[in-house]
Structure formats: structure tokens, C-alpha cells
Amino acid sequence: MHVQVRTLLSAPFRLMIASGLVLGVAVGVTAQPRDQNGAGNAQDDAAILRQGQEVTAKVCSTCHELDDIYKKRKTLREWDETVADMATRGAEATPGQFALVKRYLTRTWGSLPVNTATPEEFRAVLGLTEKEAAVIVEYRKAHGPFADRAALSRVEGLDQAKLDAQLDALVFAK
């Protein structure tokens, strides 16, 4: 039987820990191995996602059922807040493990507001390269909001398979 011991920390100290965690998570998400075109190695990405799944199961299952995670997709910011909240509530993990949990959840269970998303959000949720993410944002600036997936397919230079793999993540609200 696993017994989790929690220490009651002052509110300012918990806030400091959560702030540090959010910064560490942000660095962990953006500091991905890339080549000169902003492309990540697909094998490295797959390995990171496998490791993320394992760490997520370990860290999250000590407090709740894993099914609780998958009730609602969340944006990059919402996963930031969720993981920071987990840390302040006593979830046991290193900052690197929290960053990996957040990266995994954002990538596999993220929600992407296509018409307002930043390049960072496109990369985090869909696994796009920096170049692909920038092309989408520039196209959106030049042509206006995307009505649906078909409109997004008009953007040249995208790996359409990456978009199709995460159709449920795409939100086209106006």
C-alpha cells in the first residue's frame, strides 16, 4: 500500500513552487530538438510521447483515475494551469517530469483554437515544425479566420497527416 505524505506549505511558498513549475514546463515544451528548418526528429518525438505516457500514468494515478484526465480537452494554457495545480496539491514529480506530463497531455489531449492560436500552440498540440506553425499564422493573418478543416487544408507546406491525426483538437470557433 502506497501512502502519500503531504506537507502543508504556506500559500506564498506554494505560489512560488507553482510559478517555477510553469516556467519549467514552458521551457520543457519549447526546448524541443529541432533542425535548422524547425523540424523535430519524429523518432525523438515518438520516444518523448511514450515516456510522457509512462510518467503521466505514474504521477497522475497516485491521486485520481487516469480516465479523469481524458474527460475534456484543454488548451496549452489550461494544461499549464492544471499541472501547476497538481504540483501545489502535492503531486510527486520533478520539474522535468511535470514538464513531460504537460507536454504529453497537451500533445495527446490538447485543444487548439485554430483562429487565435500562436505558433507555439500549433507546435505543442499538433507537433508541427516552427516553419509549419508560422505558415498557418501568416496565412490566417492574410486571409482571415479558418471556417473548418477544409479551409486549413489550403495552407501550403503543411504535413496534412499531422492535422488529420488531431482532428478532435481543432476548434474553429469564430
Which role does the model predict for each range below?
Residues 1-11:
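N-terminal secretory signal peptides that target proteins for export/translocation
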Residues 12-26:
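Bacterial N-terminal signal peptides
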Residues 29-55, 110, 116-118:
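Electrostatic cytochrome c docking/interface patches
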Residues 49, 65-91:
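Gly/Gly-Pro-rich "capping" loops immediately C-terminal to redox-active cysteine motifs
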Residues 56-67, 101, 105:
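The canonical Cys-X-X-Cys-His
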Residues 64-66, 125, 129-147:
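Amphipathic, charged-and-aliphatic alpha-helical interface segments
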Residues 88-98, 124-126:
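Electron-transfer interface patches adjacent to heme c in soluble/periplasmic c-type cytochromes
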Residues 99-108, 157-174:
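Alpha-helical interaction/regulatory segments in DNA maintenance proteins
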